[in-house]
Amino acid sequence: MSSGAGSRRPREPPEHELQRRREQKRRRHDAQQLQQLKHLESFYEKPPPGFIKEDETKPEDCIPDVPGNEHAREFLAHAPTKGLWMPLGREVKVMQCWRCKRYGHRTGDKECPFFIKGNQKLEQFRVAHEDPMYDIIRENKRHEKDVRIQQLKQLLEDSTSDDDGSSSSSSGDREKRKKRKKKEKHKKRKKEKKKKKKRKHKASKSSESSDSE
């Protein structure tokens, strides 16, 4: 009895047992979901029954399979087909244009600045029609231009008003100067007349004194 009682596993507390059962349930549920996802992925990736696979175009097929082109065909067969994804969702293609010498597009692509094929007006209309920000940018530029014109007009009006004020003030100063000059001249004349009268009076007195003697 003692050996049988000693070999028994001690009972776990009810809380630990509940936690263990929940963990087992969660693992079973995760395993079932994983199996379902694998099934869906394999089902949708497999071609339908009776599907005849056509010949796929391979990247190395653009180079003729002739002696001497083995290295180039091998390079194209294992070349990366996806671009390098940069931050903000911008894709950089590993290719160079021989016209503009920029990376990211090939010769003849519409992204090239030297692309001049087709009608330029139609291309501009296409860009304006496809780009949702084109109208907003154009309106912003027009608004900035109008604001700039208004600012320049205001500056011009302020400068003309300042010129008018300065001209009026300068004309007023000139008139004041003229009046001062006239007053000064008048005072000088009066002083000169007084001096002349005094001289005449002195001369007459001196003549009278000489006559009396």
Curated annotation (Swiss-Prot):
Q: What is its main location?
A: nucleus
What's the superkingdom here? Answer: Eukaryota
Task: List compositional bias (Basic residues) regions by residue number.
Answer: 176-204
- Region of interest (PIM1-binding), residue spans: 1-147
Query: Could you provide one GO biological process annotation from this protein's UniProt record?
Result: RNA splicing
Q: Which GO terms describe its cellular component?
A: nuclear speck
Compositional bias (Basic and acidic residues): 9-21, 52-61
**Sorted UniProt keywords:** Isopeptide bond, Metal-binding, Nucleus, Phosphoprotein, Ubl conjugation, Zinc, Zinc-finger
Q: Name one GO molecular function term.
A: zinc ion binding
Q: What does this protein do?
A: Is thought to be a target protein for the PIM1 kinase. May play some roles in B-cell proliferation in association with PIM1.
Task: Provide the residue span(s) of the region labelled Disordered.
Answer: 1-61, 154-213
In its UniProt entry, what is this protein called?
Retinitis pigmentosa 9 protein homolog
